[in-house]
Each structure stands twice: as structure tokens, then as C-alpha cells.
């Protein structure tokens, strides 16, 4: 049989190369870009907080002016130009994965949203807000990978879902330098399932993003390595149980506050949010500044420095620190600006560990702090496996793995008595069916009241955190509720994203109260 001519081999090789590139190269390139973006974003946030600290050291009272001003500006810019960038970003990713990615990703994972997420979270940390960068990094990673779908000639829902999942997991892994946590996070929190076909893609993306992060930052653990000693204390089991209950109650109350804003926030403030959301944001900024001054500046920022200082013994904090930090954290999320809750939750948990050390004086303080960190994080996220894997990798605490697992499990169960899973509940808002159209006159009047986003932006904008507030006890008659809805009809852009796919579960009582 004669050999084919050499020129005839080139088209076959070209087609094979393109097929290999589309099958593997896009994921590899995306993972590398996600790792690079995570490192650069972390450095930007760190620089922003150092700038805030330098300004505060120059003038202690400056946050009273700076924080409200930045809060107002951030909310105005978010609502005007970057609807979909609010909050941590993880609910947006979950909503995209649980529905048709092409429909939800086109609104929640665009490059415009990515830019707004980075920009406004930087402004938030520059103003001293109690926000983290890890949650936003998840949305940034998912958005970067999702936008690579255009390299596929025939993109489908399966490819898009794999891109989003791999980008989100790689983003979390690169943000914390915790590769195992990235895998567990994708399985437990994002999809609640395991696909053998997607596992190879997921692990490859995490490896490549992690290699980039390690190459730029070096091999490190997020909180360093703690010393647990050669022998565990006799009261370790009691300490695990008490810590899990305390942090479970605290984390559950935090989730309840975010998901039931209409039940505890005064009516005047709710009305202020509906009519003047920018003014409401300025008041939240003022509250953050006042709490920060009362705490001596320890509640500003994500809390990473405070948590690490407690772990290595270089810092002493008041027993009121975790409560003040919780107040600042709630005030940071009520306005609806971009920002994560992972790092602040770890800081609050460290504060509770420091508080409980007054009870368990014979225990190692770093050990107790590690237990409290995993307990509070598990209570807030209600993802116990992800929580203990994250903390275990961050402190290199393999010796504590059983204690961390037990604390995370008990704490997440205690938290569920107070509130449902936070991220899943927030994701349901994006999956909820659209609000029926209102009369043009009512829509115009409502638009004049909010004065935030033009009606033509409605299809690209998810719901606002405090819009269409309602009690969940069902005591209000349907007719009265309909009349009240007509009287206080939100603008079209406040109605939430139009659910274009029937795969998204329709929830009648979606979380309209929190961000």
C-alpha cells in the first residue's frame, strides 16, 4: 500500500491538533488564567487594605467620612452598571450550575460583571468594609472559564457547566492555596453531586491554577502551621462539643439576620432602602466606621491579620471582638456591595476561640481557635466537609482532622435550626420566576423612586437584596399582598433575572432580604 503524500498529512494533523486543543487546551488555558487572576486580585485587595490602614493611621477619625462615602459610591455603581456582581458571588455560580448555564451565565458571569466584582470589592476594602476576597474569586474564576466557551464551535450545556464548575473550584483553591478544598467545595457546595466524567477536568484545572499561584506566591499555608503539642488534652471532646454549639448558634444567627432582614430591620430603614438605597448604604458605612473605631480598628477589613495574630500569639483581642465583627459584617452585606464571607467568618471564629479560651484554660489557644474557625465557617456555609478541609489545609492541621470534622458537623447541624443553607437559599432568588409585569405608569413611578438603573437593563440585572420584602409567616392575605405589591411595585430591574429555563426550581419564598 503506497504511503500518503506528505502534504496530505498536514490537514489531518491540523484537524487533530484543533480537536485536542478544544478538548484539553481550553481548560488548561482557562485554569492558568484563573490562577493568575486569583493572585493579582489578592494582591490588589491586600494593597487596598494597606492603603486604608495607612490613611487611618494618619487620621483616626477618617473612616467616619471615608467609609460612608465609599459605601454610597459602591452601591450606586453596582446598581447602575454591575447588577449581578453583588454579594459573595457563590450564589450566582450555584444558580448558573443548577439552571441552564447559557441563560444565567450570560447575565451573571459576563466579563462586565467580572470587572465590576474586582473594582467594587476593591473599593469596599479601601473603605474598611468587612468583606473577603475568596468568594468573589470563585465568581471571577467561573466567569473567566465560562467566557472561554466561545472557543468551542458547538458549545452545549455540559461543556458550559464543566467550565463554570472548574473555574469556580480553581478560584477557591488558588485563593486559599487549598487544592483539596477546591475539589470538595465543587462537590459539596456547588453541585451537591459527583460526576466521574468531570472529575478529571476539575482536578486538572485546580492543579494548573494552584501551580500558577505557587509559582507567584511560593509554597505557603494561609494561616501558617500551628503547634498542637504531642498529647491532646483530656477535655478535648468537651471543648469540641461546646465550641461547636457556640459557633453553630452564632453562625446560625448571622444567617438568620441576612435571610430575614424584614423581620428585624426597622421599617423606616427598610423604607429608606427602597426609596434611597444610596443613603441607606451610607448609613451602613457609618455603622461600620463607628464599630471600627470602638474596636480600635480591629473590625475593619477581612480580619485575616487579626486571626493570624491570634494563632501565632502576636496579638491580643477583646472578648467582644467576635460580636463587634459580626455587627460590622452584617452592615457590610446589607447594602449589597460585592464581597465574600469566608475570611471574615474565619476571623469571627478565631475571636470565639479566643473567648472560649477563658473557659478551657488548659487547652492550647491555637487549637481552640482552629476548632472555632471551622465551627463558625461550617455554621455559616452549612458545608461541613468543605469547612474542615479548608481549615485543615490552611493551618496544616492534619493532627486535628478528627476534631475539626466533629466540630464542623455539629456546628452545621446546630446552625440549621436557625436558618437554611445560606448560599443555596440566596441562589434560589436568581432561579425564582420573574415577577409579573406591572402597569407602565406604576413601573415609571417606581423607577423614579429608585433612580438607580435604566429599564433597558432589566434583563441583565438580578434582584436587589431588600426589594419585595415580605414576612414568611404567611399571615398577610393574598389580596392584601397583591394590593401592597401594586402600591409599592419595584422597578423592572428590581424584579430579578428572567428565568428562561425550566430547570431552575421555582421558589415562592425566595430570599429577597439578603445579599
Predicted regions and their residues:
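Alpha-helical transmembrane segments and immediately membrane-proximal extracytoplasmic
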Residues: 1-497, 501-515
